[in-house]
């Protein structure tokens, strides 16, 4: 497979970007996208709403776990299987469907995902046996999970690297807010309707309303189908009602020069990206941060409802709210900072290379312009995670637990935004597939640690467990140091093609 590995090499990607910039620098180019700021805002709203149901579907289930354990007359460890299974399928599904979206368009895959999600939610609300509940949760995850990766693909379609971070941050912030407030919503539904079935009826209704909205206004953005947005899609599934309105109709100029060539459907595409050494070292810490956040949410509901705190379901739900807000704010701040820092480093690069011919310039250090910002979320995760475990262990005041969950959720959301943006930058033609790698790593790690959480707590206690998780986070964070070092060395040791030719001639002489 050496040929496939070369195809997805980061260094090759960066060099190709440099050559592309040189070739087109003197040409009059069509705009990167015809989507204006209002169009992008509408897309952010639609994608955020769709992704919200994907994000909320996992944590909304947590407050119901004690109730479901009693209802199905089973044990907490057996009940956790449904949580782990959900996370596994949430990770696997986007690696397949994101390729479908890259090949056949974003719109039909998103709409199909919502339909499957709604149908499964209705089925779960009528379930009376545990094995069927666990099975249907797998289908629920597989149905709606792809929208996270596809949303990042849309950002790659309509945003340049200079402003891509802002859109990824805004969309992922609104989506991950569902992950933050899911516990509160689940607790409110159980308390208000006195049945766990209300959770899935709520999800079905919310998903159905979102489907109608998306069906009307979600425009196709895939550059393989609509180019920069100026080409009218041929397939009816890719056509939104929106494109027939005067505001959008005037932008349809059928500029086929902006159309990307269609590639074959490659089911292994995401895995070819996933197992690149530098990509894997970036995915591992971001996935570990998300996994730590997920298990902290699980412990939060279990411990606060236990005899130690004896909180009601609704009171536990309220504790979830602050970290949900922190998650949303964190992603928005990350998006702003990514845009600002990219422009700062790009301007610095342009000034340094002002007197260097285009052909002799090293490629812009795109990796450093993204990953340098990870130092803040890394520090916040270490502080928040270690404090969370020991505060629960010794039954400290609830405010200390809330503050620690704020640090954890803020850190996880910022890390997700940074790593997702970087992968979309590196693989813009496979933006959906690259973003699905983030999803795959975060969900599989979350499934792994959720599955073994009870056993680790039994052996080490809460404080020891979260201290161990802190250490694992620190260990995986070393991967980012390696990636940054490699990127900087590549920049410092760059030899231009002209210099190579001169050296070669000198040796011949």
UniProtKB/Swiss-Prot annotation:
Primary location class: membrane
**Where does the protein end up?**
Cell membrane
Cite a single GO MF annotation.
transmembrane transporter activity
Does Transcription show up as a keyword for this record? no
Q: Name one GO biological process term.
A: lipid homeostasis
What does its record list under induction? Expression is repressed by caspofungin and during chlamydospore formation. Also regulated during white-opaque switch, and by NRG1, TUP1 and HAP43.
Looking up InterPro entries in the UniProt record yields: MFS, MFS_dom, MFS_trans_sf
Cytoplasmic compartment ranges equal 1-41, 97-106, 156-169, 219-278, 334-370, 419-432, 477-509
Which Pfam families is this protein grouped with? MFS_1
> What cellular component terms from Gene Ontology apply here?
membrane raft; plasma membrane
What superkingdom heads the lineage? Eukaryota
Membrane topology (UniProt): Multi-pass membrane protein
SUPFAM superfamilies noted in UniProt: MFS general substrate transporter (SSF103473)
Gene3D superfamilies, from UniProt? MFS general substrate transporter like domains
| Annotated TM spans | 42-62, 76-96, 107-129, 133-155, 170-190, 198-218, 279-299, 313-333, 371-391, 398-418, 433-453, 456-476
Role, per record: MFS antiporter that does not display functional linkage as drug transporter and performs functions that significantly affect biofilm development and virulence. No substrate for transport has been identified yet, but plays an important role in the growth in the host.
Family, per entry: Belongs to the major facilitator superfamily. CAR1 family.
What name has this protein been given in UniProt?
MFS antiporter QDR1
UniProt gene name = QDR
């Amino acid at each position: 497979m050496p040929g496939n590995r070369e195809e997805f090499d980061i260094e090759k990607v960066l060099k190709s970007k440099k050559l592309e910039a040189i070739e087109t620098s003197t040409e009059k180019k069509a705009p990167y996208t015809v989507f204006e700021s209002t169009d992008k805002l509408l897309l952010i709203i639609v994608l955020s709403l769709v992704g919200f149901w994907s994000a909320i579907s996992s944590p909304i289930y947590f407050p119901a776990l004690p109730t479901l354990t009693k209802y199905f007359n089973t044990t907490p460890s057996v009940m956790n299987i449904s949580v782990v299974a959900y996370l596994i399928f949430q990770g696997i599904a986007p690696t397949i469907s994101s390729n479908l979206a890259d090949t056949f368009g974003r719109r039909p895959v998103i709409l199909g995902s919502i339909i499957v999600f709604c149908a499964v939610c209705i089925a779960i609300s009528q379930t009376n046996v545990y094995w069927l509940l666990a099975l249907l949760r797998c289908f629920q995850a597989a149905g709606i999970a792809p929208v996270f990766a596809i949303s990042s693909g849309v950002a790659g379609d309509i945003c340049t690297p200079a402003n891509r971070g802002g859109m990824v941050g805004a969309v992922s912030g609104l989506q991950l807010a569902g992950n933050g407030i899911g516990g509160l919503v689940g607790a409110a539904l159980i308390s208000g309707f006195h049945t766990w079935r209300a959770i899935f009826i709520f999800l079905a209704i919310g998903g159905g309303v979102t489907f109608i909205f998306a069906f009307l206004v979600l425009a196709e953005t895939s550059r393989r189908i609509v180019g920069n947005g100026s080409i009218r899609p041929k397939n009816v599934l890719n056509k939104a009602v929106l494109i027939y309105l005067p505001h959008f109709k005037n932008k349809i100029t059928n500029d086929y020069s902006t159309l990307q060539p269609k590639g074959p459907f490659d089911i292994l595409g995401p895995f070819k990206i996933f197992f690149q050494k530098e990509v894997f070292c970036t995915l591992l810490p971001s996935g570990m941060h998300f996994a730590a956040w997920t298990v902290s949410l699980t412990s939060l509901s279990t411990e606060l409802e236990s005899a130690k705190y004896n909180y009601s379901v609704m009171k536990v739900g309220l504790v979830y709210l602050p970290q949900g807000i922190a998650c949303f704010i964190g992603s928005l701040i990350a998006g702003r900072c990514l845009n600002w820092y990219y422009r700062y480093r790009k301007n610095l690069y342009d000034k340094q290379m002002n007197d260097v011919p285009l052909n002799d310039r090293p490629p812009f250090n795109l990796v450093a312009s993204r990953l340098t910002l990870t130092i803040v979320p890394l520090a916040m995760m270490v502080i928040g995670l270690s404090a969370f475990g020991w505060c629960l262990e010794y039954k400290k005041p609830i405010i200390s637990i809330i503050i620690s969950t704020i640090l954890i959720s803020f850190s996880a959301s910022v890390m997700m935004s940074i790593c997702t943006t970087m992968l979309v930058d590196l693989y813009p033609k496979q933006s959906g597939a690259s973003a699905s790698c983030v999803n795959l790593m975060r969900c599989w790690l979350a499934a792994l640690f959720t599955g073994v959480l009870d056993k680790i707590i039994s052996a080490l206690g809460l404080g020891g467990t979260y201290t161990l998780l802190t250490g694992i986070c620190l260990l995986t964070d070393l991967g980012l140091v390696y990636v940054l070092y490699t990127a900087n060395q590549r920049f410092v040791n760059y030899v231009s093609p002209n210099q190579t030719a001169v050296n070669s001639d000198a040796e011949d002489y």
